[in-house]
Amino acid sequence: MNTSMQTYLVTQEDRSAGRSTTEIVEAAIDGGIDIVQLREKETTARRRYEIGQTVRTQTAQAGVTFLVNDRVDLAAAVNADGVHLGDDDLPVTAAREVLGQDAIIGRSVSTPAAAQRAEDIGADYLGVGAVYPTGTKDVTAESAEIGPKTVTAITDAVSIPVIGIGGITPSNTTEVIRAGADGVAVVSAITTADDPAAATRKLQGSVDTASVESQLPSEEPSA
């Protein structure tokens, strides 16, 4: 999969400080976001479809990857680039049959074993978390605050890209990237920011810096 996944926005209009999802997406695109995932679980299917049509146009014009959370049917209806699936959604294999071989299909996981299973059945990337405490996503006891060490264990177990999610901000992005993640996914860090475009640029800068630092050789302890 030849898609940049360093910065990944998950939309949530009810956490966007009174602004529309399309406004947030436009600002994030201006700030250089790599991926936009349409979530909007609090809206009706019709409303989500309408938002999805607009976001598809926005992302297509900007060359930004567009995914839909959970709903394979909606992803197909708005011609999204793919879908992100959780434990209660369609299996990766079923989603692939509907969306085709070129679709990008992500899978949420919180353990190395689940990560390996997802890779084995054809997931293109993994959303790993919640890395830190979060109020924007319902998580099970197993997946609550898994921490950077589990991110490392998962990245060591698979060969597909790993995206950290859950409680991530520019201030802790370095820790997540150093743990082995290829990128970070956020909601509030962008959607609640006074300037979502600037927040996106700040997040990208944090990822870029952390990526460079993670490739530097470790300093040997002094004798």
Curated annotation (Swiss-Prot):
Residues annotated to bind 4-amino-2-methyl-5-(diphosphooxymethyl)pyrimidine: 37-41, 69, 108, 137
Pathway stated in the Swiss-Prot or TrEMBL entry: Cofactor biosynthesis; thiamine diphosphate biosynthesis; thiamine phosphate from 4-amino-2-methyl-5-diphosphomethylpyrimidine and 4-methyl-5-(2-phosphoethyl)-thiazole: step 1/1
Statement: the UniProt record of this protein carries the keyword Oxidoreductase: no
SUPFAM superfamilies on file: Thiamin phosphate synthase (SSF51391)
GO molecular-function term, one example from the UniProt record: magnesium ion binding
One Pfam family in the UniProt entry: TMP-TENI
Cellular component GO terms, alphabetical: cytoplasm
Compositional bias of kind Polar residues: 206-217
CDD domains with a match to the protein in the record: TMP_TenI
Residues at which 2-[(2R,5Z)-2-carboxy-4-methylthiazol-5(2H)-ylidene]ethyl phosphate binds: 134-136, 167, 187-188
Cofactor binding mode and count: Binds 1 Mg(2+) ion per subunit.
Entry keyword annotation includes Magnesium: yes
Disulfide linkage: none
E.C. code: 2.5.1.3
Protein name: Thiamine-phosphate synthase
Physiological role: Condenses 4-methyl-5-(beta-hydroxyethyl)thiazole monophosphate (THZ-P) and 2-methyl-4-amino-5-hydroxymethyl pyrimidine pyrophosphate (HMP-PP) to form thiamine monophosphate (TMP).
An annotated GO BP: thiamine biosynthetic process
Residue ranges of the region described as Disordered: 197-223
InterPro entries on file: Aldolase_TIM (IPR013785), ThiamineP_synth_sf (IPR036206), ThiamineP_synth_TenI (IPR022998), TMP_synthase (IPR034291)
Chain residues that bind Mg(2+): 70, 89
Organism: Haloquadratum walsbyi (strain DSM 16790 / HBSQ001)
Entry cofactors: Mg(2+)
Annotated keywords: Magnesium, Metal-binding, Thiamine biosynthesis, Transferase
Catalytic activity: 2-[(2R,5Z)-2-carboxy-4-methylthiazol-5(2H)-ylidene]ethyl phosphate + 4-amino-2-methyl-5-(diphosphooxymethyl)pyrimidine + 2 H(+) = thiamine phosphate + CO2 + diphosphate; 2-(2-carboxy-4-methylthiazol-5-yl)ethyl phosphate + 4-amino-2-methyl-5-(diphosphooxymethyl)pyrimidine + 2 H(+) = thiamine phosphate + CO2 + diphosphate; 4-methyl-5-(2-phosphooxyethyl)-thiazole + 4-amino-2-methyl-5-(diphosphooxymethyl)pyrimidine + H(+) = thiamine phosphate + diphosphate
Family indicated by similarity: Belongs to the thiamine-phosphate synthase family.
Gene coding for it: thiE
